C-alpha cells in the first residue's frame, strides 16, 4: 500500500463539520463591512520579498524568522504573504487608488508564517482585514474601532472581548523615546532574556511586548511612550479616547501595547479575550501614515486592522453554540425503486427553484426506505420526502417530519413547495 500523504505541519484542512461555521463567520464579516461602505480588494498570495522587507521591517521577527521565501526560475526572490496591509498598499500605489483619494477597503484570504504551530496560531492562517486611506483625523480611527466592535455584537460575544489602545506618537517623538527606553533597558540587561536582548539591539520597543513574566517584572517601571508624545499626537489620541467614550465603547489604555510591525505610528489597538489562553488577541490594528510613501507612493494617511479567522472561529465555538449544528440538509428526498428516481429528480429540482435558500439533498445509490431514512437522519434534515411508484403515478409526495413530532402528510406536487416552507418554518 502506498504511503499516505498528510498536510504540512501547521497547515490545516477545513472539514465539512466546521466549514459551515466558517461560512457564517465570513458572511457576517462581509455584511458588517458592507454596511460601512467598504469595498473588497483581492491581492496575490505571492509578492516580491522586498515588499515585506520594506514595509514590515528587516529586523522584525516576521522577516527574520517567519517568512516563506523562495527564488523562482528567474532568480527573483518571492514570498508567500505573511500579512495583508503591505499588499493593499502595493496594489493601491500600482493602480492609482490612493493619491488624493479616500478609500475604504477590506480583504480576506490565506497568509503564511513559519511559526511554531499551537492552538490558535498556524503556519497557514486566514486573515480578514480593513484598510482606509486618505483620512488623517481621529474620526476614521474611531470608525474602524466601531466597525470591529460591531463584529462582536453581531456574533453575540461583545462581553468576552476587551479593547486596549495606545499611541506610538510621531516618528520623531518615537525616535526620542527610543533613546530613553534603550538607556533604561541597558541598565537592566542582566534581567532580560535572550529574545529581549536581541530586540534591544534591533527593535527595542518590542521588549515592552515581552510575554516572559521575569522580563515583565524587570520593565514594570519602564518609561511610557505616552508620556513622551508630541503635542499633535497627544491631541489626536485624547480626541479619540473622548469619542470612544461618547460612543459607549469601553477601553483600557495599555502603555505596553506597541504592535510587532515597524510601520505603525500614533493609534494602535487590540481586541483581547481571556477565553483562548495564550492566544488572547483576536483583532489588532492601528495607524500607518508613512507606509504608502515608504513603498513609493505619495504621503497618505492610513489606518486599519486585521483579525485571524481561525482564532475567531475558535472563540465562537468556545463561547457559543455556533458550530454545534452539524446538519447539511433541510430536506432529504428518498426514492423507492428505479422507476421513482426520475420523479425524485423532478421534485428536487422543482423545490430548489421554488425555495432557493433551502438545502435539499436527493438520495443516490438505492436501498430500502429504512436505509434511506437512516441516511436522511445523518444529514440532520428536518423533513424526508417519500417517493415511490404510487406517488409518481398520482403526482403526490409523502412528507415525513424527522425532528419535531409533526404528523406525516401527503401533498400534491403543485402544493409541495408551500407545504415544505410551512413545515420548516414551524418551531
From Swiss-Prot:
It is found in: Cytoplasm. Pfam families: HGTP_anticodon (PF03129), tRNA-synt_His (PF13393). It comes from the Bacteria. GO terms for molecular function: ATP binding; histidine-tRNA ligase activity. It is an enzyme of class 6 (ligase). Keywords: Aminoacyl-tRNA synthetase, ATP-binding, Cytoplasm, Ligase, Nucleotide-binding, Protein biosynthesis. Its EC number is 6.1.1.21. It catalyses: tRNA(His) + L-histidine + ATP = L-histidyl-tRNA(His) + AMP + diphosphate + H(+). GO terms for cellular component: cytoplasm. SUPFAM superfamilies: Class II aaRS ABD-related (SSF52954), Class II aaRS and biotin synthetases (SSF55681). One of its GO terms (biological process) is histidyl-tRNA aminoacylation. Gene3D superfamilies: Anticodon-binding domain, Bira Bifunctional Protein, Domain 2. PANTHER family: HISTIDINE--TRNA LIGASE, MITOCHONDRIAL-RELATED (PTHR43707:SF1), HISTIDYL-TRNA SYNTHETASE (PTHR43707). Homodimer. Belongs to the class-II aminoacyl-tRNA synthetase family. This is Histidine--tRNA ligase. It comes from Alteromonas mediterranea (strain DSM 17117 / CIP 110805 / LMG 28347 / Deep ecotype).
